[in-house]
Regions:
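Aromatic/basic-lined ligand-recognition segments
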Residues: 137-263
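Internal, hydrophobic cores of structured domains that mediate oligomerization or house catalytic pockets
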Residues: 64-164
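Short acidic, S/G/P-rich loop/turn micro-motifs used as interaction or catalytic elements
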Residues: 23-25, 106-109, 193-196
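Structural alpha-beta junctions
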Residues: 36-45, 120-134, 208-217
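Short, extreme N-terminal segment that most often corresponds to the first beta-strand
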Residues: 1-47, 245-263
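Short cationic amphipathic helices and targeting signals
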Residues: 12-21, 98-101, 186-189
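Short, well-ordered alpha-helical segments
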Residues: 28, 116-119, 196-201
Length: 263
């Protein structure tokens, strides 16, 4: 890890399930179905609480009704950085209300432990309640609920794409989502390469960080998409919002864009 580079703050995971008409969280049939998987599931203060692991110190998944559209700036999710679901815009347009799924007591747990717990509940809720769309506000991605499975990292980690208006041909791509675990995302500022191959490289690197931690030190290299390519990595602040730590992947000449200090 780059010395002197501040670590990100760990924040609770959030997944939003969108509906044309939201299910009633107090429905005994819903609670009964969840208890088949998690027997200690309870209805508390109009929220469903699902405990995982040690009963004395459980990781909790909490399901609650989200604020209505328009209240406090509440809006439908943005689909502009969702690239792999053609039906995203139509599904979101048909949505009118949502449930929030979040977590409590995630500190001290590995990213895998936290996501295994959260994603299992999201998957079960998607099967039981049939939402129109899943939204990951922390990664700016919208997903098809019918394709989501427990443990899937698609959605948790999103690869974004931006063209740079004042530098024709230059592109910035980054991952978004690892910052909630206190881990760096991955970015690449480049030109004249196929975006699909860069996206695959960034996603696979982000998955490696998710599973292994922030183990890519400044000056280390990762494999590129083509044959024996090796690209140097360095920690820095993200070029694009939200402000966070990233690992920048330098494609070298002639593909790297922007200004770099390679001393």
């Amino acid at each position: 890890v780059s010395s002197g580079t501040p670590k990100e703050t760990v924040t609770p995971l959030v997944v939003e399930l969108w509906y044309a008409e939201a299910p009633e969280l107090g429905d005994p049939r819903l609670l009964q179905a969840l208890r088949l998987q998690w027997p200690a599931t309870e209805l508390q203060m109009e929220s469903i609480v699902v405990p995982h692991g040690d009963p004395a110190s459980p990781l909790l998944t909490v399901i609650m009704t989200a604020s209505p559209l328009g209240e406090g700036g509440k809006a439908l999710p943005d689909v502009s950085q969702t690239w792999d679901w053609e039906g995203a815009e139509a599904a979101v347009s048909a949505s009118r209300c949502s449930l929030l799924v979040t977590e409590m007591f995630g500190d001290g747990r590995t990213p895998q432990e936290r996501w295994d717990a959260m994603s299992a509940v999201v998957c079960e809720m998607a099967q039981l309640t049939r939402p129109t769309a899943l939204s990951w506000p922390q990664s700016q991605r919208v997903g098809d609920p019918e394709l989501f499975a427990a443990g899937d990292l698609d959605g948790l980690i999103n690869v974004r794409y931006f063209s740079i208006s004042n530098d024709p041909g230059a592109i910035v791509m980054d991952t978004l989502g690892l910052h909630v675990f206190g881990l760096p995302d991955v970015q690449c500022h480049y030109r004249d390469r196929e975006p699909g191959e860069i996206a695959a490289m960034l996603f696979s690197t982000a998955v490696y960080l998710f599973r292994s931690g922030d183990v890519i030190a400044d000056g280390n290299t990762i494999s590129g998409p083509r044959g024996d390519e090796r690209f140097v990595c360095i920690h820095e602040r993200a070029l694009l919002a939200p402000s966070r730590q990233v690992i920048d992947v330098d494609l070298g000449e002639p593909y790297a864009a922007g200004q770099r200090d390679r001393r």
